[in-house]
Design a protein with these regions (language model features):
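Short alpha-helix in the alpha/beta-hydrolase fold that links the catalytic acid
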Residues: 78, 202-212, 221
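Acidic catalytic loop of the alpha/beta-hydrolase fold
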Residues: 197-201
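Short, proline-enriched alpha-helix->beta-strand connector loops that line the catalytic pocket
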Residues: 185-190, 216-219
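C-terminal catalytic histidine-bearing segment of alpha/beta-hydrolase fold enzymes
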Residues: 214-270
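Primarily recognizes the serine-hydrolase "nucleophile elbow" in alpha/beta-hydrolase
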Residues: 125-186
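Serine-hydrolase catalytic machinery in alpha/beta-hydrolase-like enzymes
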Residues: 35-137, 233-246
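Bacterial N-terminal signal peptides that target proteins for export
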Residues: 1-12
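Short beta-strand/loop motif that positions the catalytic acidic residue
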Residues: 192-194
Length: 270
């Protein structure tokens, strides 16, 4: 009897380990991508849709807001990364079809237009949310937003607009707000993932953002990565932190892990 019981326990442990290993080593789903044309008034836009091919019905969606270059190869790379988690990702086109920056000299005025007109910025991002919810693979009740740099500002503005999403995640985004009282409209969880040495996000902006979140009773979290500057998720930013914008592998991996953990918390049975 004792041998039988011991053997049963060994089998149970072995089975548990095998199951755990199977989950840990499960292959990510294959992903597909396509562009989606849509309009706001008479203006045309072209977003990027990247989604998992799972055959399991509807999946949670991610509204992605691009960096100041516009929808680009970097946007696609990050969208594919998220889609491999079993999420359908729509990268909204803030600028308009065919309007893409070729370099910082183009990006600065493009991004500046929307940083200076938050109402227009919100309208562009909110329209993208509508397009995402229209996709047949997407569960419209399970949506988060994620943005990078300029796009990080965009997803926080989406939250300030009172959008009905579960969470917004800003990767090295701008935190300032010309209308901090709009924090009272936030329904979503707000996650800000920042580089400790980002020269483009001032200490005063961080303090004001935190005060906005506190006084508005938002469910929020800020994580600061030591040694990281602006654009820490973008390999194309180079490795020279002295420029103020550079890739940082540790911050990139840890921030994506933070995003992954949030998805697991919000959608445990996706």
């Amino acid at each position: 009897m004792m041998i039988s019981q011991a053997f049963s326990r060994v089998l149970l442990v072995a089975s548990t380990l095998m199951a755990t290993t199977a989950v840990a080593t499960a292959s990510p789903p294959s992903v597909k991508s396509k562009t989606i044309d849509y309009k706001i008034g008479d203006q045309s836009f072209e977003g990027l849709y990247v989604y998992p091919y799972t055959g399991k019905g509807k999946v949670p969606g991610v509204l992605m807001v691009h960096n100041w270059m516009g929808v680009s190869d970097e946007t696609k790379k990050q969208a594919e990364r998220m889609a491999k988690l079993g999420l359908a990702v729509f990268a909204v086109d803030v600028y308009g079809k065919g309007i893409r920056a070729k370099g910082p000299q183009d990006a600065m005025p493009l991004a500046g237009k929307y940083k200076g007109d938050r109402k227009l910025f919100r309208e562009r991002v909110l329209r993208g949310l509508e397009v995402l919810r229209e996709q047949k693979e997407v569960d419209p009740a399970k949506i988060v937003a994620a943005g990078y740099c300029f796009g990080g500002t965009g997803v926080i503005e989406l939250a300030r607009a009172g959008a009905d999403v579960q969470a917004v995640v800003s990767f090295h985004g701008g935190l300032d707000s010309p209308t901090p009282a709009d924090g009272k409209s936030i329904k979503a969880k707000v996650i800000a993932l920042q580089g400790a040495d980002d020269p483009y996000v001032k200490a005063a902006d961080i303090a004001a953002f935190q005060n906005e979140m506190r006084t508005s009773n938002v469910d929020w979290q800020m994580t600061v990565y030591g040694g990281a500057v602006h654009s820490f998720t973008d390999v194309g930013a180079g490795s020279d932190a002295k420029t103020g914008a550079a890739y940082n592998q540790k911050a990139d991996e840890r921030s994506f892990e933070a995003f992954t953990d949030l998805i697991g918390e919000l959608f445990p049975k996706r």
